């Protein structure tokens, strides 16, 4: 099924207002929580809005009413802070999910699309015990990572790069070339279990 994609400048305007001042490059980099207003109805946030868990629609729906910022078709949620410059690093505990996508997305991407399925989001996906990078619904396999408990994400806005990081070795596993055109926010999708984010971290030495 073809995925609809429509850009909405009104949503972008509201989004930047809601997310407030964009993150700037600093020693500690981006610090964010998950924005419940964007969360699909199958997702619930926990641990001070730093974690997200998946549940069947109608069983544990988010308490937030339907709104223009909310993802309608896919189990997606965005971070509440935008990035417009600098190098930023955060980690995600992934051990309790078997199917997810993590990365970044334009704040005004279509709420009827899924991250990785359009050309305004850049993600690393995990499903069927395999990792892939994703852009515009095109997948590229990632080898040599296995099933870690936690992974890192390194965003270099000026270089237009998003990297998946092995947190045990502090080394880059795979780098996805991006095409940022405006503010981006951390992005997450999952169809099983839960994810937990860890932000406000320094970029590790050597990366």
UniProtKB/Swiss-Prot annotation:
Source taxon at top rank: Eukaryota
Domain B30.2/SPRY: 12-207
InterPro entries in the record: B30.2/SPRY (IPR001870), B30.2/SPRY_sf (IPR043136), Butyrophylin_SPRY (IPR003879), ConA-like_dom_sf (IPR013320), E3_ligase_FN3/SPRY (IPR050617), SPRY_dom (IPR003877)
Keyword Acetylation: yes
Keyword annotations from UniProtKB, A to Z: Acetylation
Assigned GO CC terms: mitochondrion; nucleus
Gene3D superfamilies: 2.60.120.920
Residues annotated with N6-acetyllysine modification: 53, 130
Keyword Transferase carried by entry: no
Record-listed N6-succinyllysine modification sites: 139
Coiled coil: none
Alphabetical list of Pfam families matching this protein: SPRY
Protein name per Swiss-Prot or TrEMBL: SPRY domain-containing protein 4
Source species: Mus musculus
Upper taxonomic lineage: Eukaryota, Metazoa, Chordata, Craniata, Vertebrata
Gene from which the chain derives: Spryd4
